[in-house]
Amino acid sequence: MNTNTKKLVMAALMAALTCVATMMIAIPSPLKGYINLGDCLVLTSGWLLSPVYGFLAAGLGSALADLFAGYILYAPATFLIKGLMALIACFGFRLFHKKCSNLISRIISGATAEIVMILGYFVFEGFMYGFIPSAVNIPANGVQGIAGMIIGIVLMKTIEKSKITRLC
């Protein structure tokens, strides 16, 4: 199969899986968002795909979940925030992988991406609802970020053992 076709198919698959994982378990948070498992696939998109395909898969999959779940106002911000998370995961892994093990590289890049998610939604919700009320969602986003990072790292271990080639 053509390499570009393989990358496109993998990105589409990751976008679909991200959308499903985001919607499958959705626990409403205090403001208008929700806690979900989509971050594990957002990070996996960054670690597995190229920067552009990772950004698009993570951003589109997450934004589609917001649209389908009725969080229409969140969709544009989600597209940017989750896309940036995948970019940070990809570039962070590439940078630290030269000096550290896969596990440490994924922890550093994943934690950095999750901090961007927490800050991104804090700023977005701050403009929508005020910065004091938006601070209420920081702990929920932190829990989601930690869970997403742990599950994403375990998922990547499984992918590496199955000998699926890295496309990044």
Where in this protein do the model-derived segments appear?
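Loop-helix junctions at membrane interfaces
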Residues: 1-168
